[in-house]
Structure formats: C-alpha cells, structure tokens
C-alpha cells in the first residue's frame, strides 16, 4: 500500500500548480489551481478576496496580458510562478 501513496502524490503535484498573485502594493496571495483550469477562476477569487472589481484590474504573466480563458498549461506556467496585477488606468481630463 505504501507504494501507491507516492504515485498519487506525484500525480497530484503534476495536476496542480501553486501560483502567486502579486499586487502593486506589494501584497502576495497564493493560489493552488489545476493546470487545465481557466485562470478566470483564480482571477475572480483574487478579486473577491481583495475586494476589487475584475473590471478595475489587469493580470499579466511575463509581461503579457492574461485572458480569462487561458490556463496555466497554455501559458507554460510552472510551480511558484508569479502573476502580476495592475490597476486599470483610467483616462483623465484636462
């Protein structure tokens, strides 16, 4: 039986990925998500946790915008990678 447990553990580690979401204020929130789960789930959870509207912020990975339909597997994310969050810039008037 003990031989089965490491195999299950390896499968779980390969199926899930730990991601960090870093805000502009220096805060970091960690999430565990499946590699093939759309990142919209993480984005919505982050917004709820931080009290933000998803329309007010943008998520980027390696400088590239993240779409809600993207998955960690599609973006070739690795365990402990960081997603950056930026406040949406609103145009000002003179």
Swiss-Prot record:
Gene3D superfamilies: Phosphatidylinositol 3-kinase Catalytic Subunit, Chain A, domain 1. Keywords: Cytoplasm, Isopeptide bond, Nucleus, Ubl conjugation, Ubl conjugation pathway. It comes from the Eukaryota. Residues 15-92 form the Ubiquitin-like domain. Polymeric chains can be formed through Lys-11 cross-linking. Cleavage of precursor form by a sentrin-specific protease is necessary for function. One of its GO terms (molecular function) is ubiquitin-like protein ligase binding. It is found in: Cytoplasm; Nucleus, PML body. There is a cross-link at residue 92 (Glycyl lysine isopeptide (Gly-Lys) (interchain with K-? in acceptor proteins)). CDD domains: Ubl_SUMO2_3_4 (cd16115). The keyword Nucleus applies. GO terms for cellular component: cytoplasm; nucleus; PML body. PANTHER family: SMALL UBIQUITIN-RELATED MODIFIER. Ubiquitin-like protein which can be covalently attached to target lysines either as a monomer or as a lysine-linked polymer. Does not seem to be involved in protein degradation and may function as an antagonist of ubiquitin in the degradation process. Plays a role in a number of cellular processes such as nuclear transport, DNA replication and repair, mitosis and signal transduction. Covalent attachment to its substrates requires prior activation by the E1 complex sae1-sae2 and linkage to the E2 enzyme ube2i. This is Small ubiquitin-related modifier 3-like. The gene is sumo3l.
